[in-house]
Amino acid sequence: MPCIQAQYGTPAPSPGPRDHLASDPLTPEFIKPTMDLASPEAAPAAPTALPSFSTFMDGYTGEFDTFLYQLPGTVQPCSSASSSASSTSSSSATSPASASFKFEDFQVYGCYPGPLSGPVDEALSSSGSDYYGSPCSAPSPSTPSFQPPQLSPWDGSFGHFSPSQTYEGLRAWTEQLPKASGPPQPPAFFSFSPPTGPSPSLAQSPLKLFPSQATHQLGEGESYSMPTAFPGLAPTSPHLEGSGILDTPVTSTKARSGAPGGSEGRCAVCGDNASCQHYGVRTCEGCKGFFKRTVQKNAKYICLANKDCPVDKRRRNRCQFCRFQKCLAVGMVKEVVRTDSLKGRRGRLPSKPKQPPDASPANLLTSLVRAHLDSGPSTAKLDYSKFQELVLPHFGKEDAGDVQQFYDLLSGSLEVIRKWAEKIPGFAELSPADQDLLLESAFLELFILRLAYRSKPGEGKLIFCSGLVLHRLQCARGFGDWIDSILAFSRSLHSLLVDVPAFACLSALVLITDRHGLQEPRRVEELQNRIASCLKEHVAAVAGEPQPASCLSRLLGKLPELRTLCTQGLQRIFYLKLEDLVPPPPIIDKIFMDTLPF
């Protein structure tokens, strides 16, 4: 029979004792099987044989030990070009009627100590040799009754478990080697497939197997990277019997993600099948429609029993009262049901109305105070350039200069008051016509109130909004008796000890009030109520519990006095118009004509 030459070297000359036993079967890194099937007619090794394993592993002889075991039987001759050789090899001379197998150690990652793989191993891998992820095997003696399976030199697989380290264990292991039909598989370390049956030979083996904790059953479409486990390699070792890991059935992913729990998918009212939630609760279509009709029609039901009737799939239509009460008890929301005004829209829970940023009393009060401070002159910037304390009184009529000064002070105050009003929260949202109407109607009142609050009646000083400071006598000819009424009001206002926040609210109430001819009186009223509430809360917080009502009433009692002083100011303007010394500015004339009470 012609020789099937080993891929990496020639067989050993004779199977000596060293060839049967490896120096250390637990140390090697790789086991690479090579086979040399020979017959009595086998020829010596061809000269084209590849270099032996020792050529590549020079210096690593201690790491790679070889051994032989003989398989009896007659091997049929091969029809090849080398069959004409008549000389026998050294291995066939030793055992002419048997076939020899040569195994080299191979590496097992994670099982036994040994050197890591080197560049030689990668070179051998590229040459087409197989790597097996099982632990290292042990040699087997030549046995007459051993019948090897018909395997190709490189198609055999050693399975997922290590063979026994005894001769008898290796024999039982090699008897059950299946014939691999596919191409060589890449290494897949520790990916053991589940065992399928017991094996008494493994139970007798001293090899200890410790199963992995990550047992897993595959579903459809999944496959292991290694061949199927051998039937004879079931883990019946005493070390596995007590673990319970392999005895416990592991459910697959599909089994775990099966049917939902018993309560899911059921109507919370009657227990019928329910596919989704309705009005906040998982209910069936029947209870959904019943609840919807009851809410839309505002139906009233009466229970003929004790208001505890059973509500289930069979008896849900017997008592409508108890059924509707159970709908409410499980959490169905009536506000979500669409009414006639919401047709075409999905019902939603009513949300809280969003308030503007300045809607809260604290924010509103802060805005009013800021607007007041920005519109008034600071104490450090008062203008005393025209102030004269000692002025001789003029008993005659006013001249043109005094009238012009009077008009200039009114016109300057109007522009400052307009800018102040624009900073009041909510005033800019009103229509332009309403803004002008409110501003022109309250101008004289605001002029008096702001002048009275800034002035110092005890010293006879009048501080105008522009920062100009004049003495009472300097304004007597232009303002007439009106200036004395303003100073009297100033003394009364100062006696109340009104602080800046309260005065800011009071000034806003003078502007934001009901006037004849408003286009949107409702919006003006809402803004007025917000400012009044803000003033009330501030006075209550400052004055204390016993006196908030009296303080607020005294403060609001100044508003009628302002109306009286406003009428007195209109009379003064009317008088100056009759004198016709200086024509009034157009804006003052318009205000006069629009605010006349007659």
From Swiss-Prot:
Gene3D superfamilies: Erythroid Transcription Factor GATA-1, subunit A (3.30.50.10), Retinoid X Receptor (1.10.565.10)
PROSITE patterns from the UniProt entry: NR_LBD (PS51843), NUCLEAR_REC_DBD_1 (PS00031), NUCLEAR_REC_DBD_2 (PS51030)
Induction: Induced by cytosporone B (Csn-B); directly stimulates its own expression. Induced by corticotropin-releasing hormone (CRH). Induced by growth-stimulating agents.
GO cellular component, one term: transcription regulator complex
Residue spans crossing the bilayer: none
GO biological process: apoptotic process; cell migration involved in sprouting angiogenesis; cellular response to corticotropin-releasing hormone stimulus; cellular response to fibroblast growth factor stimulus; cellular response to vascular endothelial growth factor stimulus; detection of lipopolysaccharide; endothelial cell chemotaxis; fat cell differentiation
Keywords: Acetylation, Cytoplasm, DNA-binding, Inflammatory response, Metal-binding, Mitochondrion, Nucleus, Phosphoprotein, Receptor, Transcription, Transcription regulation, Zinc, Zinc-finger
Cofactor requirements of the protein: Zn(2+)
Textual note on the cofactor: Binds 2 zinc ions.
Residues recorded as bearing Phosphoserine in the entry: 341, 351
Positions of the UniProt region annotated as Binds lipopolysaccharide: 521-544
Residue segments, region Required for the interaction with RXRA: 299-361
DNA-binding region: 264-339
Extent of Low complexity compositional bias: 134-145
Zn-finger segments (NR C4-type): 267-287, 303-327
Protein family according to the UniProt entry: Belongs to the nuclear hormone receptor family. NR4 subfamily.
Function according to Swiss-Prot or TrEMBL: Orphan nuclear receptor. Binds the NGFI-B response element (NBRE) 5'-AAAGGTCA-3'. Binds 9-cis-retinoic acid outside of its ligand-binding (NR LBD) domain. Participates in energy homeostasis by sequestrating the kinase STK11 in the nucleus, thereby attenuating cytoplasmic AMPK activation. Regulates the inflammatory response in macrophages by regulating metabolic adaptations during inflammation, including repressing the transcription of genes involved in the citric acid cycle (TCA). Inhibits NF-kappa-B signaling by binding to low-affinity NF-kappa-B binding sites, such as at the IL2 promoter. In the cytosol, upon its detection of both bacterial lipopolysaccharide (LPS) and NBRE-containing mitochondrial DNA released by GSDMD pores during pyroptosis, it promotes non-canonical NLRP3 inflammasome activation by stimulating association of NLRP3 and NEK7.
Protein name (record): Nuclear receptor subfamily 4immunitygroup A member 1
UniProt source species: Homo sapiens (Human)
